[in-house]
Amino acid sequence: MKHNIINLAQDLIRRPSVSPDDQGCQQVIAERLAQLGFTLEWLPFGDTLNLWATHGTQDPCVVFAGHTDVVPVGDETQWQYPPFSAEIVDGTLYGRGAADMKGSLAALVIAAETFVKNNPNHKGKIALLITSDEEAAAKAGTVKVVETLMARQEAVHYAVVGEPSSGKVLGDVIKNGRRGSITGELYIEGVQGHVAYPHLAENPVHTSLNFLTELTTYQWDNGNEFFPPTSLQIANIKAGTGSNNVIPGELYVQFNLRYCTEVTDEIIKNKVAEMLAKHQLKHRISWNLSGQPFLAGNGELVKATVQAVENVTKITPRLDTSGGTSDGRFIALMGAEVVEFGPLNATIHKVNECVSVEDLGKCGEVYYHILERLLKS
């Protein structure tokens, strides 16, 4: 299985699929799956290509999810090996997307192929959800596929996202959930004027200080067994014209919350509105909800993944919900248990991104064992 994984990973890496350009990656995968009797459905939205490939028609449905798009390479002269050459040196595969996530995508595909070959009459359904819009806008990829599936009431019970979850060694971390993410764009209105005549103006920076102190020190919750406490950070703040003699007429504050399952986006919005009213600030605010929190807890998929990792790596993984958002947040909306498991994340989005060849082989084994536990007849 490892040999096939590496060959496919190299083929994918050699295609410069900077988001959202797929560069033929999904076609390569689709042709392989078609030979094994997978039903293929192309779901393009705008300039994004999505593939929904299934084998079997019964419940439960196990989804392997991944993306073919990669981030830009930056200055190519800084790379030890050309970023789209997929060089293997001393057991390490180099290239943009090697770790995030063409390597683990290849492992997911080969694991599904191998399982179907060995178990052609398996129970349930295996599905691969592959998109070319994860690294950029993430507006026309997995979220659109999920909307399509939900509209026709197609069930998904379990989903394994091949994101690079491991920290120091393969298998040390499984993501069994993610925090929600919501961003506020706040404008506090004042009255512009000359700094020498403050009585004729109203400085929104000054009037907002107490509010901003309350906003940044408020304790939203204490977290829980699976999540750390909700965190708020001011990301951008701007006021003034750049001149030292003009009192600004408006203050702009952009802030983000990474929130756990102890609160909801509505609770957050209402509390911020309450604070603004308390401090009597003339304002306007808009919100962008990037994703709701999701949690697989200690469900069947988590148990299957932990057991598979232990069998293959001889390591007991730590369950973790930290880090940024992933496409798992969209699949979780279907009521599915979602986990993320993949190779080390130490080099993702960096110059000289790379992954261990041995680790990719083991990823494939883990994915195969998950299917065995959940779908073997």
From Swiss-Prot:
Binds 2 Zn(2+) or Co(2+) ions per subunit. The active site is at 69, 134 (proton acceptor). Zn(2+) 2 binds at residues 100, 135, 349. Its cofactor is Zn(2+); Co(2+). One of its GO terms (biological process) is lysine biosynthetic process via diaminopimelate. Belongs to the peptidase M20A family. DapE subfamily. This is Succinyl-diaminopimelate desuccinylase. The gene is dapE.
